[in-house]
Amino acid sequence: FNEIEYVAINDPGLKPAEAALLFKHDSVMGKFDGTVEAYDEGIIVNGKKIKFFAEKDPAQLPWKDMGVEVVVESTGFFTDAEKAKAHITAGAKKVIISAPATNEDITIVLGVNEKEYDPAKHNVISMASCTTNCLAPVAKVIDEKFGIVKGLMTTVHSYTGDQRILDAGHKDPRRARAGALNIVPTKTGAAKAVALVLPQLKGKLDGFAMRVPTPDVSLVDVVFELSKDVTVEEVNAALKEGADGHVLCYTEEPLVSSDYIGTSQSSTVDALLTRVMGGNQVKIISWYDNEMGYSTRLAETTKTVSYTHLRAHETLMN
């Protein structure tokens, strides 16, 4: 992603020296294959200075003076688009929220509905969740080929920073329990959010999450009721045909979660686990690196949004 110029980072809770160390050494991904160091005002990555800010009010950030075009809002505090618009007040042109959002102009899942993005009217964009990015490409293929009547999903998801490392208080009593010691059932809006990118599936999908004691890689276990009878072979053939190898991938290898660490696809269908019951009930398993896969789509979306904004501006000027 050399086409993207990284201008600044705003994090009130992180100092440059801490950021440089965490960037350089990752417990899951290993050591960064490049150079990173801190300086007084930020960090230097591969010789490029990236300035740091610690501003709690995004509207006060110097985005206009710095020529910032696209802000990736990843704090988790500004998932309401009305609050995220503070970045636009500060001078940015577009905001991408790296989470499910409310009041956003559009939710985009690459490989599913990115063609609906209109730079003239979509200024605050949600990227949904990593789980929605895994499920939606699968649902798109299955619905187009066979028709989805309804479905239930379980995401078997690696634990996240919103869980407690040891038993401690949390508004969700299950997430209050030690994440590395328990299977933790919890809610997810990922299934329902598919309807934001595939409107024909509104009200047809639901599900929940099972957080498990692994640091990275998750899977979606989804059961669809279809509008026609199918076989395992037909379902796998449709998924194999629909897999572009970039967003949606297909495998017949008997792999486990650690094999998917560092994979950049949003969704990798495990064809060996596809099942059909009663003709029109199908179970599909698809893996995803919930860190690398989502981060890759986020960078690609940032590039797409920036490029289309620039093209739209040039067209307007001409």
Where are these regions (language model features)?
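N-terminal Rossmann-like NAD(P) cofactor-binding subdomain of oxidoreductases
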Residues: 1-176, 298-300
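Active-site-lining helix/loop region of Rossmann-like oxidoreductase modules
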Residues: 4-5, 16-17, 31, 137-242
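Short beta-strand/turn micro-motifs at beta-sheet edges
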Residues: 111-114, 207-212, 269-274
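A common structural junction motif
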Residues: 239-248, 305-307
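Short proline/glycine- and acidic-rich turn/helix-capping motifs at secondary-structure junctions
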Residues: 250-266
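Internal helix-turn-beta structural module
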Residues: 261-299
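Conserved small/polar residues in nucleotide/adenosyl-binding loops
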Residues: 308-315
